[in-house]
């Protein structure tokens, strides 16, 4: 295939600005699917994506387009996620393309994730086409949004395209702009094969499938390929592209994006960002690959049925193949048995992974409270990362603790600014900058990551009636005054409930969690004490009163000694029950107890 007829582009936008709908219209305009196969969010293959109305996995499709001049072009479209938790998917997709369609809702304007994604595209030296979507809405104001694009982002918006992905207005203009304004891929077809591994996933019929972008050379069926990071050699069984259905081809050449299968059995053999080359004629050096992302939120997942442990391990391995930003390690808990300590890029990422495990692999799971990574330096001046609250050393062994901070960018209508400032200040935030564009305020705040993990995003949306948008980047570590808050049920330590809390919130958080546990744990025939402790100091306590059988009901008259005898016997029985009885804490109680609202 002549590379001058190829265009590789990604669609980037803030969440809910119409990326997937625009992708649907482009597919429809190029007749890539029969009318009976067209449906909304055609590239969103997971049920979770359709239900939540979001894109989680970046998807590719090759479109064949005949221009107004009568020339045939092959367009490789990548529909990317919009949520901040899936920014790694976006960066990987952008590395495989030469240009981007920046989609902006013409009624909402530029939002926080719009900024984050466009900066990623600029880092990848992309040619950017600005597309103002939803121009058919009564509330649309394209001129105002053009002004925002120029003042906030710094892009020339004079040639921005006005589009309605829902009704199809302006779709042909987008297709023409792609072939006229985006560059063709560069590369040498005669050079040794050099391809970057963009994604991988497990297919029940084909085994491990890898998605590649060809930088140099040609990748053919039957060729022996080598993974440059491991040196492993495989023979290519199948070569294909998505149209959006799988379509087998004989070869992929410079600039093309497609998939291959090569009988790969080892999950760890497919490292995203790895360079694929021909074994017989290897390229001189590997491609730079992608900048690895580190998980920032950690949570433990335990199977409700202990016999499902191996099934969970296998499921996590298959998910990690498809999501390189997700990590997991084995851990054990006295309360919950064996499970895995998992790392995620954010709370939505955590929710999606847990939901996928439960749906796709039919697992019943218990999740503990999410926590962030603390850097702890002990008295011997040794620093280590603490992912699990139970690994935090005793207070007398610690020299200092540092917690992760983020730089948050918040865009909010000015009428909600006061409430937004109060929210950020209440989360121990430090204001960095405040500027205005029309009636929108652009806030920059430094915040501790631990403060935004649970409910910050929900409260931000609630305060602003849904109009505020939020994006964040890691911004280093700062000294922190934190302690480990532990919980005891009838004097037994429950390790699954331990959490690391800022010292200013220990008592209030301990009290709230104890109250929540009191409501969640079923009553027994004896009294249950729920205590929150820091070290040996009890900071909060709640008591679940027992069921009481009226043992004196059968005693007639005024036989006080008989009544006292029966009550004493009941007391001894309850004491014996309490000493041998195990409290059964419902699985749902662990996560519900720790999701405390401020």
From Swiss-Prot:
Subcellular location per the Swiss-Prot or TrEMBL entry: Cell inner membrane
Domain tr-type G: 4-186
CDD domains, per the entry: EF4_II, EF4_III, LepA, lepA_C
SUPFAM superfamilies assigned to the protein according to its UniProt record, in alphabetical order: EF-G C-terminal domain-like, P-loop containing nucleoside triphosphate hydrolases, Translation proteins
Enzyme Commission code: 3.6.5.n1
Membrane topology: Peripheral membrane protein
PROSITE patterns in alphabetical order: G_TR_1 (PS00301), G_TR_2 (PS51722)
Catalytic activity: GTP + H2O = GDP + phosphate + H(+)
Superkingdom of the organism of origin: Bacteria
Gene Ontology biological-process annotations: positive regulation of translation
This protein's GO CC annotations: plasma membrane
GO terms, molecular function: GTP binding; GTPase activity; guanosine tetraphosphate binding; ribosome binding; translation elongation factor activity
Residues bound to GTP: 16-21, 133-136
Keywords attached to this entry: Cell inner membrane, Cell membrane, GTP-binding, Hydrolase, Membrane, Nucleotide-binding, Protein biosynthesis
Main location: membrane
Similarity section: Belongs to the TRAFAC class translation factor GTPase superfamily. Classic translation factor GTPase family. LepA subfamily.
Function: Required for accurate and efficient protein synthesis under certain stress conditions. May act as a fidelity factor of the translation reaction, by catalyzing a one-codon backward translocation of tRNAs on improperly translocated ribosomes. Back-translocation proceeds from a post-translocation (POST) complex to a pre-translocation (PRE) complex, thus giving elongation factor G a second chance to translocate the tRNAs correctly. Binds to ribosomes in a GTP-dependent manner.
Protein name, UniProt field: Elongation factor 4
